[in-house]
Structures are given as structure tokens and as C-alpha cells.
């Protein structure tokens, strides 16, 4: 499995069966990647919460880092999450109007920065309102609306950031590629972490605020004295 160059074998698997992405020579199943179902569940449940109550569920966004290297994972927001009355991604978000779109932007940024490859189901990159159905095309007309175009532009910018910076992907399966700066600021629902590159020269610092509260003069530490660019 997965021996042909350019071919990727991905397992949609939700049990604790070990070595799904391990080599067959070592008793594994030989898949290239495995869906991270635990991350998907925790992420969507957290994002649905009113920001006021997120402080009580802070660990839902940090728990996946404790097992992120047990397999070669892909972070998935699949068709399963936007059908059968589960709502589209934008309609999972709490609040009204601007708050919904701001929540979705923060969620997508967290997903892009988290270790693991990425898979987002079609339509969610421009905040499709209706659930997906195989009986109709996507609601492309929504892109005439500024808020939907803004989400598409945001996701495009995240993809460009991902492609441009090796720290976002080259150590996905190595604990050396990810470091929490502050995983415990539950009262303000802020997460900060660093993605490291192999040469440890072009690292990226993520600071994500999951409340609508503006935080002025928020201090973030870095692990060593280096020049940083915002």
C-alpha cells in the first residue's frame, strides 16, 4: 500500500486499532494517513459553544496534541459533519452575523496551524449556509455576498501561508514541530503555540482568541531570544 510515488492511501477509521499508518513490515496496515476523528469531534463541539462557556471546555482544543504523533493524521471536516441536520460549518458557529464569521475564521486558523494534514469539505471554504446534498450543486451565488467572499479569501490566505512556510507541515509527524506557548489560558479562551521548521529558523507563532473580547497588551512568551516579525 502507498508504494507508488504520488499515491496516498487515507483511512477513515475511528477505533483505537494501532499502527494504521505503520509500515506492514512492522505490523502496521500501511496507510499514508488516518482521519483524526477525535480531533474532529472535539473541535466541532468546542466551536459550537457560546464563547462565554468555552473556558469550561478549554481542554477540548488541546487534548489532540497528546496523541497527535501516534499515527500520521489528517485533520478532517468532512461531508459527514455537514449533513443529516448537523448544519454547515458556518451554522454551527454561535452568535449572529459578524460573530459567526469571526468564529469560523478563528476555527480555520486553529485547524491550519495544528499538526496534521488538512481536509475541508467543499463549500465550507466560503461558508455555505445549507447542508450539503448530492442532489444539487453548491450555492456559488453566495460568493456575491461580502461575508462569504471574505471567508473564501481568509481560507485562501491560510493555504498560501501553509504553502509558503515549511514550519506548517514538514514536522507534522514529529513532536519537535509543535510547541505550546500557553495551553492553559482557559479564562480568556486564548491558545498560543509555535510551529517549528526543521532548521528551527523560520518558526511561526500562533495566538488565537476564541472570544469576542478584545485583549489589549496581551503578553506572549517565546522560548528563546530571537527577532520576531509580525
Predicted regions, residues:
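Conserved alpha/beta catalytic core and glycan-binding cleft of carbohydrate-active enzymes
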Residues: 1-134, 163-173, 177-227
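A short acidic, glycine-rich active-site loop
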Residues: 96-98, 142-149
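Segments forming glycine/polar-rich beta-alpha architectures that bind adenosine-containing cofactors
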Residues: 230
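Catalytic cores of secreted or luminal carbohydrate-active enzymes
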Residues: 146-172
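Active-site His/acidic residue clusters
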Residues: 132-142
